[in-house]
């Protein structure tokens, strides 16, 4: 039996593209708006004028305005 005969009358489905993570592009994202954050290795290549620091280790995401903390800061 030919595969074209077995599918007659059936609609063909589009395959979903596979998401692959490229190591160079593998950086953390904001948990609220999913915008990409600066990697520590890129810190010398990027202008830091857009980073809003709050108090201590807390940063503010410029895309959505949410405050970003380290996980160990929640325990204290």
Swiss-Prot record:
<comment type="similarity">
    <text>Belongs to the orthopoxvirus OPG146 family.</text>
</comment>
<dbReference type="InterPro" id="IPR007769">
    <property type="entry name" value="Poxvirus_A19"/>
</dbReference>
<dbReference type="GO" id="GO:0042025">
    <property type="term" value="C:host cell nucleus"/>
</dbReference>
<comment type="subunit">
    <text>Interacts with capping enzyme RAP94/OPG109, the two large RNA polymerase subunits RPO147/OPG105 and RPO132/OPG151, the two early transcription factor subunits OPG185 and OPG133, one of the capping enzyme subunits OPG113, the nucleoside triphosphate phosphohydrolase OPG123, two core proteins OPG129 and OPG138, and a virion protein OPG064.</text>
</comment>
<comment type="function">
    <text>Plays a role in the maturation of immature virions to infectious particles. May also participate in viral transcription.</text>
</comment>
<dbReference type="Pfam" id="PF05077">
    <property type="entry name" value="DUF678"/>
</dbReference>
<dbReference type="GO" id="GO:0044423">
    <property type="term" value="C:virion component"/>
</dbReference>
<dbReference type="GO" id="GO:0030430">
    <property type="term" value="C:host cell cytoplasm"/>
</dbReference>
<protein>
    <recommendedName>
        <fullName>Protein OPG146</fullName>
    </recommendedName>
</protein>
<keyword id="KW-1035">Host cytoplasm</keyword>
<keyword id="KW-1048">Host nucleus</keyword>
<keyword id="KW-0946">Virion</keyword>
<keyword id="KW-0597">Phosphoprotein</keyword>
């Amino acid at each position: 039996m030919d595969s074209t005969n077995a599918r007659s009358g059936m609609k063909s489905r589009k395959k979903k593209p596979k998401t692959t993570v490229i190591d160079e592009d593998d950086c953390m994202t904001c948990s609220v708006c999913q915008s990409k954050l600066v990697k520590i290795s890129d810190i010398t290549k990027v202008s830091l004028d857009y980073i809003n620091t709050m108090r201590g280790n807390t940063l503010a995401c410029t895309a959505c305005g949410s405050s970003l903390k380290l996980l160990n800061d929640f325990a204290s």
